[in-house]
């Protein structure tokens, strides 16, 4: 059977909080089968746990946050969640001594490195996949996102970014997901934003950790980062990275195809909630090794 995965060892790193601009320590711990993905704030007494859950997600102008019934939140979870999806990690405890996951370089690549450093351990329990059985679509004005049946995991994403520095032919990406494709083609894509928005947020004491070190920053005419883009389609690639993390808020890899136009965290989350609210739209699936879609056949141990 295809088995659940966790980490082999505890790993730790430090980074800067996007909101606070302060140092954040991040610790990833192995977890037993069927634990799921648990985010934990250790700066609170007692510590507060936030299980990955589509219904706990709150989208903000800056990031994705998980919020519990008491209104306590943990922010900026999206890129680490994408890395967990990319590596197929089912069970992990994620500890931070702050209200947010560190932003690192604005991509998922540092988290991939951290997970690979910990190593992957397989557990004696079947891995459960969420298989899409019928199309589900969410629309918001001209924006839309849908999940349809597909024997694998494919993402077909289009953005519409009218900017002189962004080529019109670099605004669509179709990806057949695998751990290898995520690590090689997706994980290094950074988040992006406009200088005017960052300056405004910082004037309001927000986004104090935002910088050229952890985002692609644009003005009305050009990309302001000295090194430019890591690859020509980095912006749409980051939107795909975000979607992979958003869909993994159900705690399971999805078997299906996501198609989207101008979608973001909020629409992605609405789509996942709509699927989970319709019991005829999905089923839980486990696989023997020879049955699994090739997408999910190999753990992601390729070095980034």
From Swiss-Prot:
GO process terms (BP): lipid A biosynthetic process
Keyword ATP-binding assigned: no
Record-listed Zn(2+) binding positions: 79, 238, 242
Active site: 265
Pathway listed: Glycolipid biosynthesis; lipid IV(A) biosynthesis; lipid IV(A) from (3R)-3-hydroxytetradecanoyl-[acyl-carrier-protein] and UDP-N-acetyl-alpha-D-glucosamine: step 2/6
Annotated protein name in UniProt: UDP-3-O-acyl-N-acetylglucosamine deacetylase
Lineage: Bacteria, Pseudomonadati, Pseudomonadota, Gammaproteobacteria, Vibrionales
InterPro entries: Ribosomal_Su5_D2-typ_SF, UDP-acyl_GlcNac_deAcase, UDP-acyl_GlcNac_deAcase_C, UDP-acyl_N-AcGlcN_deAcase_N
GO cellular component: membrane
UniProt function note: Catalyzes the hydrolysis of UDP-3-O-myristoyl-N-acetylglucosamine to form UDP-3-O-myristoylglucosamine and acetate, the committed step in lipid A biosynthesis.
Pfam families for the chain: LpxC
Enzyme type, top EC level: hydrolase
Entry keywords, A to Z: Hydrolase, Lipid A biosynthesis, Lipid biosynthesis, Lipid metabolism, Metal-binding, Zinc
Family: Belongs to the LpxC family.
HAMAP family (alphabetical): LpxC
Keyword Ion transport belongs to the record: no
Cofactor or coenzyme needed: Zn(2+)
Enzyme nomenclature, EC number: 3.5.1.108
Taxonomy, superkingdom: Bacteria
UniProt-recorded Gene Ontology molecular function terms: metal ion binding; UDP-3-O-acyl-N-acetylglucosamine deacetylase activity
């Amino acid at each position: 059977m295809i088995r659940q995965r966790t980490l082999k060892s505890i790993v730790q790193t430090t980074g800067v909080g996007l909101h606070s601009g302060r140092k954040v320590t991040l610790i990833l711990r192995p977890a037993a089968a069927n634990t799921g993905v648990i985010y934990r704030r250790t700066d609170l007494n007692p510590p507060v746990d936030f299980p990955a859950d589509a219904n706990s997600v709150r989208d903000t102008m800056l990031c994705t946050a998980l919020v519990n019934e008491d209104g306590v939140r943990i922010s900026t979870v999206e890129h680490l969640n994408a890395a967990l999806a990319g590596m197929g990690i089912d069970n992990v405890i994620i500890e931070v001594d702050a209200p947010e996951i560190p932003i690192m370089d604005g991509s998922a690549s540092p988290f991939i490195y951290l997970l690979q450093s910990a190593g992957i351990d397989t557990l004696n329990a079947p891995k459960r996949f969420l298989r899409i059985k019928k199309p589900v679509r969410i629309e918001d004005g001209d924006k839309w996102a849908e999940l349809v049946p597909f024997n694998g995991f494919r993402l077909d994403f289009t953005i519409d970014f009218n900017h002189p520095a962004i080529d019109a032919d670099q605004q669509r990406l179709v990806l057949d997901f695998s751990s290898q494709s995520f690590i090689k083609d997706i994980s290094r894509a950074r988040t992006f934003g406009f200088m005017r928005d960052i300056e405004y947020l910082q004037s309001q004491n927000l986004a104090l950790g935002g910088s050229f070190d952890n985002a692609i920053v644009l003005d009305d005419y050009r990309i302001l980062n000295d090194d430019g883009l890591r690859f020509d389609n980095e912006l749409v690639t980051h939107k795909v990275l975000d979607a992979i993390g958003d869909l993994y808020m159900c705690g399971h890899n999805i078997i299906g195809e996501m198609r989207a136009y101008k979608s973001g965290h909020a629409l992605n989350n609405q789509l996942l909630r709509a699927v989970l609210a319709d019991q005829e739209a999905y089923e839980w699936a486990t696989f023997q090794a020879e049955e699994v879609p090739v997408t999910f056949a190999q753990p992601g141990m390729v070095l980034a």
